[in-house]
Curated annotation (Swiss-Prot):
Catalyses which reaction(s): tRNA(Ala) + L-alanine + ATP = L-alanyl-tRNA(Ala) + AMP + diphosphate
Organism: Picrophilus torridus (strain ATCC 700027 / DSM 9790 / JCM 10055 / NBRC 100828 / KAW 2/3)
Binding site residues for Zn(2+): 585, 589, 689, 693
Source lineage: Archaea, Methanobacteriati, Thermoplasmatota, Thermoplasmata, Thermoplasmatales
Gene behind the chain: alaS
Pfam families: tRNA-synt_2c, tRNA_SAD
Annotated protein name in UniProt: Alanine--tRNA ligase
Chief location: cytoplasm
Amino acid sequence: MEFDLEFFRENNFVRKQCSVCSSYFWTLDDKRSTCGDPACNGYSFINKSPVYKKYNVDEMRDEFIKFFENDSLPHKFVEPYPVVPRWRDDVLLVNASIYDFQPQVTSGLAKPPGNPIVMSQPSIRMLDIDLVGKTGRHLTSFEMLCHDSFNYDDNYIYWKDETVRYSFRFLTERLRVDPLLITYKEKPWFGGGNAGNALEVFVMGLEVATLVFMDLKEDKNGDIELEGTRYSRMPLRVVDTGYGLERLVWLSTGTPTVYESIYKRSLDYIIKNSNAEYVSPEIMARISEIAAEIDPYSDELVLSRINKTGDKKFMEMLDNIRSAYGLVDHARTLLLMFSDYVIPSNVKVGYLARMLLRRSFRFMEKIKFNGSINDIFDAVYDEFNKIIKNYDKDFINNIIKIETEKYKEMLRSAPEIIRKHINKNTISNENIAKIYDTYGIPLEIISKVFKDLTNKELDIPENFQEYLVKLHENVKKPEKTVKDYPDINTRPLYYNDTGIMEFTGIVMYSNGNEIILNQTAFYPEGGGQPADHGYFLYNGKKIEVLDVQKYGNSIVHIINGSIPGHSRIKGFVDKERRTQLMIHHSATHLLLGICRAYFGEHVWQNSVKKDIDESRLDITHYKKITEDDIKNIENMCLDAIMASKNIHVKNIEWNRAISEYGFRLFEGGFPLSDTIRVVTIDDIDSEGCGGTHLKNTKDILMLKIVSTETVQEGIQRIVFTAGPAALRYSQKLYSIINDEQEYLKVPPEKIPEQSIKLVRENIENKKMINSLERELAEIYIKNALRIDDESFYIKSNEILSRVILKYTGARNGRFIINTGSRIYISSSYNDADVIASMLSNNYSGSKRVAICDCNANENLIKEILVKIKR
């Protein structure tokens, strides 16, 4: 048995099989028949708290942390990580405390920040968003309390027995829970590419913790298979515990729902300033108890069990309090997102933020909240300021102002958008998802507008919001081309000295036009920086280096030719190209730091691309960059260049780097390594980077922004050039200005004025020409030869024929215009192409307008028209 532990044996725990779900569990109550899961025996703690006193969230957090900090084996307290995990690219949000240490620590690459550790990690899980406010227990954000240990072959900390012992001691010694009320349910665990056995901890039906014993990692070649996925043993064993802070607080208060236990002050504020009011505690407690036993949740079933189906007055009250619950929950989640400067948008984590905001706006409308969402943020922040560390009100106010306008515009356009997607008096689930995703129209508004338009109810599945969240939380990592190369461990000379442009190496591997050396000064493509070019000298011949790529520890050179293995060769890096790329790379870091200083701390690097002539930097920013912004940023960059700021590069141990520089380190990605190569420009920017850099900002020489644009909501692109490339760009602009000056016959400062003048004159001239054309066409049409009641014949030249044709298109009748070598036909009877085909084999056009090569007189045309009318 996986959990035949000394702790269980010495305390006389018994292992039983649940009479309801058949799972195995451990208990001190030998008469117990159920595992403690609410689906098996429901809640019994509401109004009967087993905890000796009531805690609030701050008190419970402190109680937990101090218990482990002051233990005989002291646990190191670790400050919470951000909720946006910029140290990994496979998830959008931190769902649990272990996310902080995947994959670097759990893979064995990096050491943990302490061992053992204790922390309280804010986490966001959006999958249950449909259930928030309904079940009494679901939240989109929560704090996961944890005490974790990382066990290595040469450093054992603690494993299953000690972990269970800790959980039991905390519950019984600190919270004074009756030991007979605690059950440990056996259950396998999977998450984030790892797996292991686990115990779920229940008290009176409430799951208060999960104790995970992680020792497996996903491995397609692994020898262990669990639920269709293959695993292999990890290089270390990790104790990953998760105690729900809010659940423990709820257990201590025994309130009807979790919301009253953790959001009491915020809820009171909302109820005081809205139409919402508390529903009877007895009824809310009953709803929570029934909801705990139902999986999947059904609102209809819950309401039928409390005998409230069809009670409109009660349903309005219930709907209002649920909206208030949703408001406080969403406000805390949004504040956590905003503390990490998430900008609402239609993609990735921004999509989830906008979803929460628009649901919040809708809740406020339903309960007629007398105030703004900022007021709610203030109230919630007052309750949770110990965990929401960054409350940037200016940033939040700007975001809310923009999002409120977008929400109003969405409401204005919603009816027409929804109307277009109605087919046979319904809207398919696919189109509902499209309306929500593309236009951001909440499901409730889709339902309301649909009913207004069709007088019918729209059937939207209860968990549809969960389906939408899954679509956006499913992060697809870019597939990397995997090639089979030997692990040569090429020594990179470009890090030791970026000035090395010549070197000697030995060919360790050769296959066609690909070679791997023992060492190289050629920088491989990576971090948005293109590969170096140059050549090798072999047997007196120059062999061009076309590309350089890194696969694992091997640096592969793609060459224009072949060089046999074991050859000793000399390499020459294209110095001009490398220097320009170094300038653009260092300039990118400078520009990012300046943009953050200028716009605010919400600026993060979204993506970059460096090149020879120009580079681009995409940053997070919620407004379009103006001309004034560009000038100010350029001036600030110039000041930094002229100030000769030093650029430092150093390798720092993973945890120390995070401690010293924070999570800005991961703006350009993250290394799968135990160290981070940190590039710092004095007091301007620090980030992890594997690229080549200058030693001082003065070597950037100059920086010029070429263009800016909004590439998607919340993302601004800056295209810029620096160094010699900036000089070439300026010279090109000067050449263009010089040509314009010559052409316009004005000095440079008058070019804009003269250009505007010419454009206006051109517009006026076009208007005049159009007027003259219309008058001339009218004269020809008026004097046209009438062939019959419907048809007219006009003789003209080629240029005038096209003008006349333009003004006959909107008239009734057939107009045949002869130029002498070509005939144009305009017909409101949709037979222009037929007439053209009868006049000539060489014709083209449509039913309305056609053209053919011929010189037919009016008599021939009369004959053809007679035939057509038959």
